[in-house]
Amino acid sequence: MKKKAIVSVISVICVIAVAVGIFAGCSSKKSDSNTSNSAQKGAITVISREEGSGTRDAFTELMGIMDDSGNDATAQSAEITNSTSVMMSTVQGNKNAIGYVSLGSLSDSVKALKLDGAEASVETIKNGSYKLQRPFNIAYIDGSLSKEAQDFIKFITSKEGEAIITKEGYIGIDATESYTASKMSGTVTLAGSTSVAPVMNVLADEYKKLNPGMKIEIQESGSSAGIESAMQGAVNIAMSSRELKNNEAAKLKSQKIALDGIAVIVNKENKL
């Protein structure tokens, strides 16, 4: 747990409360009437991801938002969104909102806050000054991958794959081998993180240009759901924006494909 980062986020929330003249804690009401009243009074609206989201799991762990038993202690009254895109649009549409998203998905529709004076960027993640960072992983049943799935993974972890990952705003692995098109035909199925999905879609598109006979099916279901699907053999590959838990790692092999930051975001009208 990074204590300085925790203090920074708490300070950010307190500054927002002071700016609007009301200290409302870190929660909001879900009902339309209460949400409306909160907006009029300037209360903070905390936006969180759903249970099972890898981004939520990583955020709560890194920020120490856990109870004494180590369980997620996200406020029950926080508004829940089920994807990165919904989180962005929700914060964009509510000038009192505060939330968090994958750095690679960050756009100018919202504003990212500094933590400990460091902006969320590829450079600050690389040098370690921005503490909210987590891995992007793929996971699969070792020894059970189809040749097609193995070939797609070979592309993802190649120099060509790393270049795509870097271009999309993430930090790639240190790939050592180049990819040679296999010209295979078949289907590879993936499921999981809505944070990993955008870069995975770009990787899939570039891979299919090299291998026109291949079909890559990507389902955005959340990290935990994707991992469960892979464990059950329902998909070839899981996408996860968190590390695998012990029970998951006992059944699946995981590979890091990138490093990503988590940006704390507010509405662009916010003065911070």
Protein language model regions, located:
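Sec-dependent bacterial lipoprotein signal peptides
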Residues: 1-24
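Exported/periplasmic ABC-transporter solute-binding proteins
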Residues: 8, 21-22, 26-272
